[in-house]
Design a protein with these regions (language model features):
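ABC ATPase C-loop
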Residues: 147-148
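The feature captures the beta-strand-to-loop junction immediately N-terminal to the Walker
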Residues: 33-35
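Conserved ABC ATPase signature
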Residues: 130-134, 138
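Helix-to-loop junction immediately C-terminal to a conserved catalytic motif
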Residues: 48
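ABC-type ATPase nucleotide-binding domains, specifically the catalytic core motifs of the NBD
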Residues: 12, 92-111, 119-121, 215, ...
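Conserved catalytic motifs of ABC-family nucleotide-binding domains
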Residues: 151
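Conserved ABC transporter NBD signature motif
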Residues: 56-64, 73-75, 108-113, 215
């Protein structure tokens, strides 16, 4: 579904991504794990069309990925950004509807809203509440649901567990598994290496903008280098 070849991204003189090669198969959960500052968010923003690569190639379903963010979204790729980035002064319902703003199948939007309530039951109770007043875990639920409202085929999740209480982290990863079981392909950038690797079909470890290890999630969970550096084992 997604193939990244020798991707390089720079911020001025800072070389943020170095010859990144990565593939995402349709229907899989693929994780990119690494410490803060490893380049995970830069990768996700580049795939979403928010940053322009200096070189390299990104193919999505066999063709080059557009450079404009709205065209990337139109192709079926949606980024749920780090720290959620909700519209704090809009209600939960209004935030969800913002996720569907490019859709032309307006008649299906309400049924998709109801699907979000099934996935995140507490959301229906919060529809009229301003997003800025929600807890961190509730905000993350809304952010993911807003992304799903665009009906993507590839969902990019950037640090979905960041800043959440342990019980909310568990609930969040459970929801991600359920979304994947419904057919969604997911690329996940995450510092919580254990949870991410445990649920992933394939995974990549990133350090200072480079992919240093790759393999199945299960294989990386048992890799001595990964266990020592990222799992504290």
């Amino acid at each position: 579904m997604l193939e990244i070849k020798k991707l390089n991204v720079k911020y001025g003189q800072i070389h943020a991504l170095h010859d990144v090669n990565l593939t995402v198969a349709s229907g899989h959960i693929v994780s990119v794990v690494g410490a803060n500052g490893a380049g995970k968010t830069t990768l996700m923003m580049t795939l979403a069309g928010l940053l322009t690569p200096s070189s390299g190639e990104v193919l999505y379903e066999g063709t080059a990925l557009p450079k404009e963010a709205y065209k990337v979204l139109g192709r079926g790729i949606c980024l749920v950004p780090e720290r959620r980035r909700l519209y704090a002064n809009l209600t939960v319902k209004e935030n969800l509807l913002m996720g569907a703003y490019l859709r032309i199948d307006k008649a299906c939007i309400q049924s998709d809203m109801e699907r979000m309530y099934t996935l995140f039951p507490i959301m229906e109770q919060r529809l009229k509440q301003y997003a800025g007043t929600l807890s961190g875990g509730e905000q993350q639920m809304v952010a993911i649901a807003r992304g799903l409202m665009s009906r993507p085929r590839l969902l990019l999740l950037d640090e979905p567990s960041l800043g959440l209480a342990p019980i909310m982290v568990e609930n969040m990863f459970k929801a991600i598994r359920e979304i994947n079981c419904q057919g969604m392909t997911i690329l996940l950038a995450e510092q919580n290496a254990f949870q991410a690797l445990e649920m992933s079909d394939d995974a990549f470890v990133m350090e200072t903008g480079r992919i240093i290890v790759s393999g199945t999630g299960k294989a990386l969970l048992n890799d001595p280098v990964v266990k020592k550096a990222y799992l504290g084992i």
